Amino acid sequence: MEKSSNRRFGVRTVAAIVAGLMVGGMCTAMTASAADDSAAGYSATAPVNLTRPATVPSMDGWTDGTGAWTLGEGTRVVSSDALAARAQSLASELTKFTDVDIKAATGSATGKDISLTLDASKKAELGDEGFKLNIGSKGLEVIGATDIGVFYGTRSVSQMLRQGQLTLPAGTVATKPKYKERGATLCACQINISTDWIDRFLSDMADLRLNYVLLEMKLKPEEDNTKKAATWSYYTRDDVKKFVKKANNYGIDVIPEINSPGHMNVWLENYPEYQLADNSGRKDPNKLDISNPEAVKFYKTLIDEYDGVFTTKYWHMGADEYMIGTSFDNYSKLKTFAEKQYGAGATPNDAFTGFINDIDKYVKAKGKQLRIWNDGIVNTKNVSLNKDIVIEYWYGAGRKPQELVQDGYTLMNATQALYWSRSAQVYKVNAARLYNNNWNVGTFDGGRQIDKNYDKLTGAKVSIWPDSSYFQTENEVEKEIFDGMRFISQMTWSDSRPWATWNDMKADIDKIGYPLDIREYDYTPVDAGIYDIPQLKSISKGPWELITTPDGYYQMKDTVSGKCLALFTGSKHLDVVTQVGARPELRNCADVSVGQDQRNTANERNTQKWQIRADKDGKYTISPALTQQRLAIATGNEQNIDLETHRPAAGTVAQFPADLVSDNALFTLTGHMGMSATVDSKTVNPASPSKITVKVRAASNANTGDVTVTPVVPEGWEIKPGSVSLKSIPAGKAAIAYFNVVNTTGTGDATVQFKLTNTKTGEELGTTSVALTGSLTKDVEASDYAASSQETTGEHAPVGNAFDKNANTFWHSKYSNPSANLPHWLAFKASPGEGNKIAAITHLYRQDKLNGPAKNVAVYVVAASDANSVADVTNWGEPVATAEFPYTKELQTIALPNTIPSGDVYVKFQINDAWGLTETSAGVTWAAVAELAATAKATPVELTEPEQPKDNPEVTETPEATGVTVSGDGVANGALSLKKGTTAQLTAKVAPDDADQAVTWASSDDKVVTVDKTGKVTAVAKGVAKVTATTANGKSASVTVTVTEDSEVPGPTGPTEPTKPGTEKPTTKPTTKPNDGKLSATGADTAVLATIAALFALAGGAVVAVRRRSVR
């Protein structure tokens, strides 16, 4: 069953993606049509308080003009032929964002239009990527010296106009990037990142004017001496060519990397002859033996295979962490090789550097420039690293960035502060800290600063690493990187801070949101519910319950066993089952409703997530979320190195790379009738009711009949409305019902159940439920943070982390140079509102590990009127509350007495004692806090009924046809005369008027008369035939058509009895009114009773009435 097509644009199917994928404008409203009612074009007078919507990166140096310009009816995107594709793309995009029909055109622009202009004479001013915007009486002008410059200008136009404001202030700006390279590392190394994800990632980069992506990945090896390396993950040449083509269209340079001579396990695991052996003879598949000419040749062959696929002028060889976890002392053969190759006194570092230089020479012969990570630069005796190699600096050990500047190397800033990792919690880009602490492109790892204007500093990038990859799905990564991507965009293009704080920038980037490609991507193309999936019969006959997950996948539950489908067993890379031919299995169902912060269940949870994609002929593909291979019914003919040792039996379901399967990887999903519910916010308090969306789905092959959705809430909760009735839902469609729910007195966990019943009979058809958590308090605004100390050297753990609403970050007391001792405290200003009091303090310990959580704590509260800031408070008085916390990472709450001051207050949370590294060990002297907050009593609001959708699909009953009449020019008394070769148009009218008006037409003799589906009659040959119109339920009416030759005078249209002389009856006046040439099957004119008799004979005398339904 396909997902209901009436979903609102930009809403990502599942509640948590709606509520959260979330941040970052993922759910920004589709249209902005209500934002402006002004006429399109320029106005000399701007509306009062009109401001220019923000863009990311910012357009600094804006010069205000006079007046304003409005996008509206009649606005076009006008360009030359050379920019026609850009114009069409922008027009389509703005149409969807604004609900204004915008066309692309070539020719001259008017003041209503957006014009795109390519002006090569602006190259000196704008460079290769810059653009100029002019907003005024000539419309909105986008000018670039290059195609990409114009394209980047359209990105800013789109961002401004997608935020709900269609009137822009007049003005002008010219902007170009501060740095040449602005982008990201995307490591599809060992595990696969889907091509869908890469496609969306490129769209996001383009929207942010980012132009560089380093892609560490495997192009499927196909040479005789490399094809044993075709283990998963890999990409085919067609895969790569498609996303490289898109990247080039966006001005993005995609640079491939095969890391060497370290991190080579996915290339060398089946080639032991190329692996480096240690002094004991043990080989390591991660290490290429650079002393072996055949191993070096193998690497160069891999480089050759990438020829003709990528368009970049660069090659990246990695060159990092060759000896990670060991040292050259364990590989004495490299010392011997170095001395032989590079002379007396040479070291393994010389051999390592010589290998890099050799690869540099090899790729230069191909017209490419080499790039490496900075830990490829080591101290040497006899060999110097070539100066034309670009150094991407990520790691502070070894040679310092300033030394490399002095030596004249070209540098890119790839600091670890801009890293994400699926498993390593320390690698989470903290955009707020970086922005607020004035990080810039000259700030290298460890805070080492070089001149940000160094002429060989190419720019900076973020890096997205997999590591132990089961901790996050790629969709969770997509959500996580939103802020950091926008931060690096701002820092590398504009190198400025036009927002006073990160919170100000964050508000704008959330309002701008994602570009169109990401908003339009359908993560869950079928509704949650029960489905028959016959192709899975080798696992279970089902049926299967599909449950949507917060990150846009499905959990697939076998309703027979109660267990869930998982891809859990098989050989792995980075802790993910990458084995080609691995078989899915049924396991106990994990809770997939939780997010990535629940790390202890990540492996069970994420191996039960499946990506379903719509494919051809109404069928679907199914992929494990972590592996991105395809489930398929094995044929026994698949070819892959993994299948040489483990091959699934033909007819069983297993995972295979997409290029190894075809129609055997297509699945039929036949839906049962069902119901599901999602909630906007699971946390509810009397001041903040939550909206529940109930979706009722019809089976794929049957309408539902009229149904009613009725909620049942526990005591202490209220819900409106009391029920929602839905008209019969057409087969394969879904309808929506909305409910608002709030807790009045209830607290803690609660379940709201929904019953689906047949409206007429009351028969129960199904149930569903949502889980909520009720609180009678709410978080209050916190500001003006302070702490007794904070650690920013050993790790980045400032006090602001305890108030950033992110459980994955934390504040830590200072523990380096020197460490601070107990007691430790954090303080902040709490603002519950005038006349209100804070009621409690909540504390959450760091979530990555338990290494000494708070044990004995005290809370102090003073009126904010007593001091100008937290730092100015000199007398905190006595604690208003104390508590003993258990040894746990769970949220702890401390109730406060009613004697504290009302209104704004300063709060100090003091940790006097801490637990040890274990529950029984001695207490530690440090402290850490993930989240600290004050709560206040929630003031109840009146619960209202939500407006119900007006576009739910429904089956409408139409009256049965009771009769039909046929009319047309020349028709009289049910008869029509035509000359051979002529035509006539007949019309059928079904009674009653609101019955189905569709009829079928037929001729009793096609050799005499033919009739088409519209009722058009053609006279073919001399003779008589009947033309009949028949309704869907069998009612019919006919016209007798007589065809004559051209010279003939038409005779009677039906048989007549000869009359005897003197026996003719006088003509009498009809007792009923003639039917004006129309013949009715229900009350015919007495003059045509003979024809009526003939009609009934044709109709067969027995008509079965069928109720006609239509879907609207």
From Swiss-Prot:
Cellular component per GO, a single term: plasma membrane
Catalytic residues (positions): 321 (proton donor/acceptor)
Gene Ontology process terms (BP): carbohydrate metabolic process
Annotated phenotype, changing residue 419 to F: Significantly reduces both the affinity and kcat value for LNB-beta-pNP
Region (Disordered): 938-969, 1044-1081
EC code: 3.2.1.140
Pfam family name, one: F5_F8_type_C
Primary localization class, coarse: membrane
Membrane topology category: Single-pass membrane protein
Gene Ontology molecular function: beta-N-acetylhexosaminidase activity; lacto-N-biosidase activity
Record field: compositional bias (Low complexity): 1044-1061
Signal peptide residue numbers: 1-34
Domain BIG2 intervals: 975-1041
S-S bonds: 187-189, 564-589
Task of the protein: Present in the infant gut, this enzyme is involved in the assimilation of type-1 human milk oligosaccharides (HMOs). It hydrolyzes via a retaining mechanism the beta-D-GlcNAc-(1->3)-beta-D-Gal linkage in lacto-N-tetraose (LNT or beta-D-Gal-(1->3)-beta-D-GlcNAc-(1->3)-beta-D-Gal-(1->4)-D-Glc), an abundant HMO unique to human breast milk, releasing lacto-N-biose (LNB or beta-D-Gal-(1->3)-D-GlcNAc) and lactose. Is a key enzymatic factor for growth and proliferation of B.bifidum in the gut ecosystem of breast-fed infants.
UniProt similarity note: Belongs to the glycosyl hydrolase 20 family.
Full protein name: Lacto-N-biosidase
Species the sequence originates in: Bifidobacterium bifidum (strain DSM 20082 / JCM 1254 / BCRC 11844 / KCTC 3440 / E319f (Variant a))
